Amino acid sequence: MKSVITTVVGAADSASRFPSASDMESVQGSIQRAAARLEAAEKLAGNYDQVAQEAVDAVYNQYPNGATGRQPRKCATEGKEKCKRDFVHYLRLINYCLVTGGTGPLDELAINGQKEVYKALSIDAGTYVAGFSHLRSRGCAPRDMSAQALTAYNQLLDYVINSLG
């Protein structure tokens, strides 16, 4: 896997020149974004259970039977713990994405095929949207993390919300 540094240096070398000031700014920006993602990952890693519980509470406060539509959500009848387990799973994948700097873990382990699975199990994906939307609106900089870290976290929440919608 190539890093932004090797890419910039390689491009400059191919052009028989030293890296320019804008090349260095690009590298610096990439490093700052990586630091923000790692900050968000660290904060999230220490609070999976609490964050997931907030999402579950938001879902059940808004939808007492655990469903946004006509069908009751499977995890509403089987208990809040299974809903929490699902949120923790997504949050761990979001954490992996923050560390890697891409959406690969979410795509491979959650998003690909999720609508078909939820439909087959009669799970209303809208409840996940409600929970993740609550988490997105709840985040606050600098209380929870820096503004740049919160932006990276919120981008991944948006990615999950849009995939479920």
Swiss-Prot record:
Highest taxon in the source lineage: Bacteria
One GO biological process term: photosynthesis
Gene Ontology CC entries for this record: phycobilisome; plasma membrane-derived thylakoid membrane
Post-translational modification: Contains three covalently linked phycourobilin chromophores.
Statement: the UniProt record of this protein carries the keyword Transmembrane: no
Membrane topology classification: Peripheral membrane protein
Keywords: Antenna complex, Bile pigment, Chromophore, Electron transport, Membrane, Photosynthesis, Phycobilisome, Thylakoid, Transport
Residues involved in phycourobilin 1 binding: C75
InterPro entries reported in the protein's UniProt record: Globin-like_sf, Phycobilisome_asu/bsu, Phycobilisome_asu/bsu_sf
Residues annotated to bind phycourobilin 3: C140
Predominant subcellular localization, coarse grouping: membrane
Assembly and interaction partners: Heterodimer of an alpha and a beta chain.
Role summary: Light-harvesting photosynthetic bile pigment-protein from the phycobiliprotein complex.
UniProt record similarity statement: Belongs to the phycobiliprotein family.
The name this protein goes by in its record: C-phycoerythrin class 2 subunit alpha
Organism from which the protein derives: Synechococcus sp. (strain WH8103)
